[in-house]
Amino acid sequence: MILGILSDTHGDTDAVKRVYAALPNADAWAFLGDGQREANLLEVMSGKPVYTVKGNCDAGDIAEEQVITLGGVRIFMTHGHAYAIALNSYRLMLRAQELDCAVALYGHTHVSEIEYAGGVQIVCPGSPSVPRRGRRKSFAKLEIENGSAMASIVAL
C-alpha cells in the first residue's frame, strides 16, 4: 500500500496536480493542513481517500489531529504547529507514542525531513508550493507492507 503525503499548498492547485502526476498509483492520501481546497481537489482527481487535518491557515470544522490505521500501521497526523515542531519533534514524538503510533506525519515547517525518535518514524513532506531552508518542492510517500512502513521524500 502507498500513502501519498502532502502539506502546505496554500492555494496552489497546480502543485497538487504535479504531486498527483508524480504518484498516480497512491492508494490513499494524507493532507496535513494549510490547503483544504487543494485537499478536496486531490480527492476528486485521485478518487482515493484523502485524510486531512487542519493547518494554522485553514478555517472550518476540520480535526486538528487524526489517527489512521493502514496495512496494520497506526499513523498519527497533525499540522504540527500545536507541538512547537519548528523547534524540535520531541512533543510530537511523545504524542505519537501516547497514541501507540509507529508513524507521525506533520507539516507547517515547509521543510522536508524524515527522522526516527523513540521508536517513531517522523515525517514532514515539505511543501510542493513554497519550500523553506533551501529545500526543493516536495511531498512524501509512505510504503506499507506486512505491517511495517518506510517513508521517502519525493522532489518535484
Describe each PLM feature range.
Residues 11-22, 77, 83-96:
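Pre-active-site segment of Zn-dependent metallo-hydrolases
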